[in-house]
A protein has these predicted regions:
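Short aromatic/hydrophobic "clamp" motif used to bind/position activated sugar donors
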Residues: 77
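Conserved donor NDP-sugar-binding/catalytic core segment of glycosyltransferases
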Residues: 89-121
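Acidic donor-binding loop at a coil-to-helix junction in glycosyltransferase catalytic cores
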Residues: 161-172
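Short, acidic, metal-binding catalytic loop of nucleotide-sugar glycosyltransferases
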Residues: 13-22
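Active-site donor/metal-binding and catalytic loop motifs
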Residues: 112-114, 185-211
């Protein structure tokens, strides 16, 4: 979280009330307000459930998420932005999905917009546009930790600190390499979702501007797009290489013969 003192309690309490919760790791990403002081109240109230990690300087959302993943020892990790909140039973549902679908390494939860600008919600293609948001942002993602580690975590390239989109690059790599469950294509799942509290500068608005109104981002160049694609391709390549290592026909010791060149 970064400068999230006003919303952090709402987010944390929505997680504390969940079942199937192992622990909460609050990662402060060099906040300049009183986020740290707010965060440090929670371990005292929930000493066995909540830990706080404070990064010395702001390094971006990808680094904060990755730090939380590294500190955790849970088999399944879920990411919630500090200005959002879970509906009840989100983690119980996520746990059940991972238990009954061991083939799925990742899951995207539904997003319910709160205080969304009316110019978007009134658009006739809003549902179509919002599906793009649900498949793009990082605050509704659940991973098997081992798989996310194999991906290298969320990409921390400077490109994404400048423009956002680290969750897009990772999500595309997952879709190209494996499977990702989605919990928003069934009408019966609308009460198991993330409450996405909207703010004027949120990434989702930029995405909706493009999908619904055809407004491109002037700050993104073709070179930026190529660099982002290269990051996605790199994650896919690492996963493919890992698959080759783990599915080799011959397992065990491999004696190597070395011949030294004559001097």
């Amino acid at each position: 979280c970064y400068n999230a003192a006003l919303t952090l309690e709402r987010a944390v309490m929505s997680v504390v009330l969940q079942t199937h919760l192992q622990h909460i790791i609050i990662v402060d990403d060099g906040s300049r307000d009183h986020t740290v002081a707010t965060a440090q109240r929670f371990p005292a109230a929930y000493p066995n459930k909540i830990r706080v990690a404070c990064l010395p300087q702001n390094g971006g959302v990808a680094r904060a998420r990755n730090w939380g993943m590294l500190v955790s020892n849970a088999e399944i990790v879920a990411f919630l932005d500090a200005d959002d909140a879970y509906q009840a039973q989100v983690l119980a549902f996520s746990h059940a999905v991972m238990q009954f679908r061991p083939d799925l390494p990742a899951l995207r939860l539904g997003l319910i917009p709160v205080d969304l600008d009316a110019k978007y919600s009134a658009h006739p293609q809003f549902d179509y546009g919002w599906r793009h948001v649900e498949m793009t942002v990082g605050g509704n993602m659940v991973f098997r930790r081992a798989f996310l580690l194999a991906c290298g975590g969320f990409p921390q390239d400077e490109l994404f600190r400048r423009l956002g989109g680290e969750d897009v690059a990772l999500g595309l790599a997952v879709l190209a390499s494996s499977q990702m469950g989605t919990a928003f294509d069934d009408v019966g799942l609308d009460e198991i979702a993330v409450l996405h509290h909207c703010r004027p500068d949120m990434y989702a608005y930029k995405l909706l501007d493009g999908v619904l109104f055809g407004l491109g981002r002037s700050d993104i160049t073709k070179a930026d797009q190529q660099e982002a694609q290269a990051v996605t391709d790199g994650i896919v390549s690492r996963l493919q290489q890992l698959h080759q290592w783990l599915h080799t026909e011959h397992k065990g010791k491999v004696p190597l013969k070395v011949e030294l060149a004559p001097k």
